[in-house]
Amino acid sequence: AFTELERVLVRGCGLARPGWLDAAEAAWADVRAGGPVRHAVVPVWRRPWMVLGRDTFAGDVLARLGVRHLYSGHPERYPRIPIQELTARGADLVVLPDEPYRFTADDGPEAFPGLPAALVSGRHLTWYGPSLAEAPAALTAALSAAR
């Protein structure tokens, strides 16, 4: 992602290399997924339930943090999956971003009884740009706090 960002910003747009790109590269260079791999369902919408599927930036970010999302092999990037299938999939974690759908402690976790829920910043999970410098720390903290 960093090479592509530099290509677009510096070579494509003729801008100076932004300082946040250096900070983001440094932040992610130190990331090493430690401990056991978590297996997660990652909804991005409700009514209907939609989750991360194949080839997504957010899926790659989570993988770097030791979280494998269970629909990474789905033919669609954001498949619609019935809640009954999501809860039966065998996840040990549900990751609930606050965008594009705004999942909260009161809206989302209740659909996954008995499953720890990590409420994460959608900006840190899905946005290219300056937030990438803060993303490893912010997402790791949210994943560690999953209840």
Residue ranges and their predicted role:
Residues A1-R147:
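N-terminal ligand-binding lobe of clamshell/alpha-beta domains
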